[in-house]
Amino acid sequence: MARRAAGGAPPSARAAAAVPLRPRPHSRGPGLLPLPLLLLLGAARAGALEIQRRFPSPTPTNNFALDGTAGTVYLAAVNRLYQLSSANLSLEAEATVGPVPDSPLCHAPQLPQASCEHPRRLTDNYNKILQLDPGQGLVVACGSIYQGLCQLRRRGNISALAVSFPPAAPTAEPVTVFPSMLNVAANHPNASTVGLVLPPTSGTGGSRLLVGATYTGFGSAFFPRNRSLEDHRFENTPEIAIRSLDARGDLAKLFTFDLNPSDDNILKIKQGAKEQHKLGFVRAFLHPAVPPHSAQPYAYLALNSEARAGDKDSQARSLLARICLPRGAGGDAKKLTESYIQLGLQCAGGAGRGDLYSRLVSVFPAREQFFAVFERPQGAPGARNAPAALCAFRFDDVQAAIRAARTACFVEPAPDVVAVLDSVVQGTGPACESKRNIQLQPEQLDCGAAHLQHPLTILQPLRASPVFRAPGLTAVAVASANNYTAVFLGTATGRLLKISLNESMQVVSRRVLTVAYGEPVHHVMQFDPMDPGYLYLMTSHQMARVKVAACEVHSTCGDCVGAADAYCGWCTLETRCTLQQDCTNSSQPHFWTSASEGPSRCPAMTVLPSEIDVHRDYTGMILQISGSLPSLSGMEMACDYGNGVRTVARVPGPAYDHQIAYCNLLPRAQFPSFPAGQDHVTVEMSVRVKGHNIVSANFTIYDCSRIGQVYPHTACTSCLSTQWPCSWCIQLHSCVSNQSQCQDSPNPTSPQDCPQILPSPLAPVPTGGSQDILVPLTKATFFHGSSLECSFGLEESFEAVWANNSLVRCNQVVLHTTQKSQVFPLSLKLKGPPDRFLDSPNPMTVVVYNCAMGSPDCSQCLGREDLGHLCVWNDGCRLRGPLQPLPGTCPAPEIRAIEPLSGPLDGGTLLTIRGRNLGRRLSDVAHGVWIGSVACEPLADRYTVSEEIVCATGPAAGAFSDVVTVNVSKEGRSREQFSYVLPTVHSLEPSMGPKAGGTRITIHGSDLNVGSMLQVLVNDTDPCTDLTRTATSITCTVPGGTLPSPVPVCVRFESRGCVHGNLTFWYMQNPVITAISPGRSPVSGGRTITVAGERFHMVQNVSMAVHHIGREPTFCKVLNSTLITCPSPGALSNASAPVDFFINGRAYADEAAEELLDPAEAQRGSRFRLDYLPNPQFSTAKREKWIKHHPGEPLTLVIHKEQDSLGLESHEYHIKIGQVSCDIQIISDRVIHCSVNESLGTAEGQLPITIQVGNFNQTIATLQLGGSETAIVVSIVICSVLLLLSVVALFVFCTKSRRAERYWQKTLLQMEEMESQIREEIRKGFAELQTDMTDLTKELNRSQGIPFLEYKHFVTRTFFPKCSSLYEERYVLPSKTLNSQGGSPPQETHPLLGEWNIPEHCRPSMEEGISLFSSLLNNKHFLIVFVHALEQQKDFAVRDRCSLASLLTIALHGKLEYYTSIMKELLVDLIDASAAKNPKLMLRRTESVVEKMLTNWMSICMYGCLRETVGEPFFLLLCAIKQQINKGSIDAITGKARYTLNEEWLLRENIEAKPRNLNVSFQGCGMDSLSVRAMDTDTLTQVKEKILEAFCKNVPYSQWPRAEDVDLEWFASSTQSYVLRDLDDTSVVEDGRKKLNTLAHYKIPEGASLAMSLTDKKDSTLGRVKDLDTEKYFHLVLPTDELVEPKKSHRQSHRKKVLPEIYLTRLLSTKGTLQKFLDDLFKAILSIREDKPPLAVKYFFDFLEEQAEKRGISDPDTLHIWKTNSLPLRFWVNILKNPQFVFDIEKTDHIDACLSVIAQAFIDACSISDLQLGKDSPTNKLLYAKEIPEYRKTVQRYYKQIQDMTPLSEQEMNAHLAEESRKYQNEFNTNVAMAEIYKYAKRYRPQIMAALEANPTARRTQLQHKFEQVVALMENNIYECYSEA
């Protein structure tokens, strides 16, 4: 016990007295709870304990002492003494007491007459005794140096000596000092010492010091092994002694043995017996601490004896020794040996010696008992996790044993009971002897006498059974409170346990607190003498003040009392959990309920009546109140109903156990409203006393008349089934609470008597078919003859005719559906308002089917016969006519794909077969699926009619491959073959890992990727997770194991037999982390933290994370099996924070700690801590920012460092000048010297000087490089030479300039010629384009028109732009069949457009929750608080804000006027925020919820304008761009084209392309052949795309086939035809690259005949052409032409560099061609139609002007910017860049690039700043620079026209918005949007609640309560339901 043996301080007298224990019934073997059961005793929350203050010590701590009167804590550490304030542990004074030069073989230097020949080495001073002597105002501090020298320091100022000892000898009378006066404590760090200040004896006037010290002299393990015989310990330091401590008397007697002869006041083991009696002292204490008058006080010593087994002196290893002290003040002192007696202590269970805890660790005395911690030694003393136990002993038992022993020694000798300690020098004799006729007095029985043998040892130990067991216990402190015993236990891992024991000494609760992880708790703990609510304890490097209870963490009486905390109880009238002294009047009965009384004593209340009819009048409420409550009679009371509604309450008379109170019911006008869908409301009522609601109960208000509204289709049965006393009035067709309203009619009295429909099965009916439906009724006599209607929901009603008393006929019912089948509920309704239905408890339904829907092939169509659908296949699924024959057979099955393609021989593989006509029903294919000769059994639950079969393969005798066949009267065969193979495994790596799991293992073998399901099992039961596999390997993560052992590993295929392959994985002991260093880091992180431990060779990955303040975790590096290095994570602030390590993906946990804690605590326990400190700060020595340096001279930098506590080492500083390192030469706390050993480059005149520490980087100055005088001379010479060279160069220049002039003239002629060519090209291109576009316009008018997207798809793509591409790829699937009608468009399955997919059993609760949430969102106060609360969260990203805005838009789409008002309020907040900063930046981006809401609002309001005005010119512009691009060559791989608007997409080569008109027929299209124009440079894919465009120009793009889905065949002659492909065997290879085939490559002539057909086999030679590797393929130009340039001639090279820029003129050509279409588009956008003015734009622009005026913003530029940011840039630019939001078209990358140029021109037109253009400006801006001024005028004119429009009133705008809402109602599923919004509400629930609480309006309207109701409804089901959905 290294730390434990270092000595300890006993508790002060006040500490022991302040926490007395109440009497306990004696029990030698109290019942124990096993550890697993203890883990279930409550939640082990650290909340029951709280560290109030800490004081860290840089050196290990040794002892502490408390001065309660002065409020001071004295702390002794190695080489340091500290004086701390007890309240906050702040430092008041300190003293340095080491290290000093010393040798254990030398006398103390204070002994002047002694000399020493041995060398003295610098030695640390370990404190051994720290005791307070308040009577003399002293602090006694004894250390391990100088043979255990003691110092007397001043109480109140530890830094000052009170007495100088040995004293300075006066010249007249020198003081003789003996070694025994100096050798007080043990002189070795690990040797134990205890001390105790004893009160003065009579006549001496001074205190005394009792010392127990382990022998460290010759022969002990502590004596230096140098064969020296100089032992200063034996003679001078006895094991036990009482020394003089009279500092006011003769100093020559200080520390001398007190009595004379001195031998009688010491106890010293004989030299020869020391080996058999090695004493280790634990604690010394007084008992009683404050003895009553004339009572006998005792001093006790608790110690361990390492006696050999069988030695007669001491059989026990744990001992308790007792010494008598003088009675009363000034009593005569007893001789130590006279009264000394010792007895053994034994803590053992009932399991024999194996359950014996033999070593005493810690002792704490109470009033009648003392508690002790024992451990069972395992290996070395002080093992961290040694088994330990707590035992309790009674002082009365000690007293009885001592009296019996003395009687047995002196009166009736019994050698087996007691013996004389003959091993002691001061003993009287070897054995007890009978004193005849002696009568021992009580004092002699207790304390012995001089004439009796002494000292004595009792041979039979005092035994006790453990009351608690746990590993690693090191300390104990005990207090009694409220019929409980509170026991505090320190552990070796730095934790503090608090357990509560009841009167039977059984554990009833347990709490754990981590004080300092990894630092053992010192074995002495003490309560604050002045306030026992605090406990002081010490770990190896910290002093802590711990609050013994944190009662405030419990908020209810049940939690408070149920926690079974000895200190906590419920303060009834203050409704809080408190300590007893913190509760007013707690000393009076029933004001404070302790935990020992149990939860049954908590206040409770019953309300009578508990159910209230809303229509009845009640005089008042009776309240029955029970539980522990003071009498409420005479107190001011009220009944609190919430929302500030209270009524007067009164108690008629005094009572306690059950009190009756009376209370007025709240007024009817203040009844809470009934929730939607409920016939009742629950009201909570509380009794309020003195401002606190002390007890609460619920009662219910119900309304019978609401039952019919809540359950309209079961009104009568629900009324008579409800729990309320309701009656059904058949005459009024209403539920009533008072039957007197309708007594004339025969009213039903039970649900069975209600008139109701008796459901009968109906055959499915086809859509549109007319039929009569008979509806049977029961108990309907009252309604016979009444006018009824048959209702089928959704306003589908038909005439109902009475057939008889119990039968109604629905005439000529015609129902329609566009679905495959639809269920219509049938109900009977009484004609006339309001809606009144006959009950249908079991709804009757009609199934309507549509053969034309949902059956794309024959098998699916005919398979519907099983559902009763009369369908027949005839070129489609049709309704079978009455005369049509029964359906025949379908075509043979068509297998399109199978997966997987292989499986194991054992079978069991789930083979998926996809195709068409795969059977009408399961029975068709039940025995018809085969793999060769092996059957495959279809699975019923996985079968999809006609489309998919999932079957389980059978076993095969051997490996083979064959096709899969499906036989359904006809046989279908797969193209691929399925293979049976035999997988094998042969090795595993790594073969070992920690038992915590997480190791990634790789299994090697062959054919491991077979089958459909794979499992890797560890130990044949535990699955390996995260599997990835290839044909030869499987990688997975092993689970955790239980015991370190080898376990088999096998691979299971298809849940069949396991393939072992002799694979074994060894579970080894987990890696252990023992320490991290350093323990401090700069807040920026990056400091290298060294992690020490064991078994790191099994670690594959490790990361380090910091709790609470940490940033991202960092990844560590494993150096070897014992060391890991980690960069410290960055932190958010300066603080101490817990650190976690994740080893192999598993959180590291100390196994010993996990045994101690319950599972919840083990997960939260912080293992290690990092102290984050501010980043270090540096500066140059003189704090200058510029340092001048001459190159070539030596450079040394002196850097000043601000003082910090990081303790950085020299290797952690990295100093650089530019990129050159500065080597550190000298480093101290304040200054760093570094020098540069290499020359600094002069390319740069200035170099930064930077210092890096971890991730922190600071530039402290700049080094300016200056030249010397030599450099100046060299510079002058160089300048002269340069001047001469300049003259020569001027002459050469003049000569060449004349040549350049001639060349320039020639170039001008070429440019004029080029300009002429460009003009001609533009003219011709424009004419051709106009012709083509005219034809296109005519086509549009003839065909279906522009392919606009439906409104709902426009909204989803605009609102959720990030997902639009996913929708296009995932949901819009191209059809492979093309007909002239184009087919029905495929549906985008966006979640907002479909059903709310949740399981039916969850639907009622969730729909109710969503309904309530919808009502909240329709509350303006809630919604605005909700939005602001979310936007204030740092992790609520921009993407989340935009998503929330769009979801709100969908949810409120039906109330656009309300949505607009919300948007305006949020905009006002945004304007206020922007106006305070820079108003011109408002609405510049979309970073807030309201900005995205504005975008969506504009999209909704401008959709009509977009479709009716802008759509056509925009579509024509897109067509024109595509036509123009297609007129020239387009490189299929790079995408660059001859004609474009974007420079980056310009093909800078003069590649001549000749047009080819091709006659093409398209098989299966139903159209004649067409003439298609293509270029001879086009690839075959480009030709296919142009052909598809020609045939499908009147069909939306989503329904086009793709180029890879069709084959193109050229009929060269009547006998020859070729399938044309981009790549084939004829492809040309140039420079190692294949060139894509073109029309010119195949030499296809003008007018050639081609045929195109759909194919199921895609061209596998290449995918998307753009994705091809440019290193292998090219089309028109070689991408790496520039790389071969050096090989060409200079002339060719020059041409390459210059000529490409000439092709920029083609941009002008393309621009000129498209100019008319662009002008038309901009005109449509920026003009106002008189018949349809833009009302939304006018309304919003007026709103902006109004807000600007309110804030005094008169700058017209600001308003212009606001308007531009609101409409043109926010809406129109988005549309211009994303035409796929509006049209069903293809947006190619090239068209996208051109649209970017056009959008930029539009942006520039809306800007008010002048364009700063020059020769270096991008061409995208230069292209339209000339048109921008005219466009700007158009924009300003548009804004002016809007301003001049007649202002709109709020009513007009609301009407317009309501019309927009109505126009597109029911387009979206708002429930889905609500559910998505709720996810945000759930995620930020605490913040939203806090915001609602802080908002007065929300608080007044109880919005937070309603929000909690939403959460309660949703949280019951939402995750379960979503997981099932």
Curated annotation (Swiss-Prot):
Residues 49-1271 are extracellular. It is a single-pass membrane protein. The chain crosses the membrane at residues 1272-1292. Pfam families: Plexin_cytopl, Plexin_RBD, PSI, PSI_PlexinA-B, Sema, TIG, TIG_plexin. Residues 1-48 form the signal peptide. Residues 893-977, 983-1065, 1071-1145 form the IPT/TIG domain. InterPro entries: Ig-like_fold (IPR013783), Ig_E-set (IPR014756), IPT_dom (IPR002909), Plexin (IPR031148), Plexin-D1_Sema (IPR042719), Plexin_cytoplasmic_RasGAP_dom (IPR013548), Plexin_RBD (IPR046800), Plexin_repeat (IPR002165). The keyword Signal applies. Cell surface receptor for SEMA4A and for class 3 semaphorins, such as SEMA3A, SEMA3C and SEMA3E. Plays an important role in cell-cell signaling, and in regulating the migration of a wide spectrum of cell types. Regulates the migration of thymocytes in the medulla. Regulates endothelial cell migration. Plays an important role in ensuring the specificity of synapse formation. Mediates anti-angiogenic signaling in response to SEMA3E. Required for normal development of the heart and vasculature. This is Plexin-D1. The lineage of its organism: Eukaryota, Metazoa, Chordata, Craniata, Vertebrata.
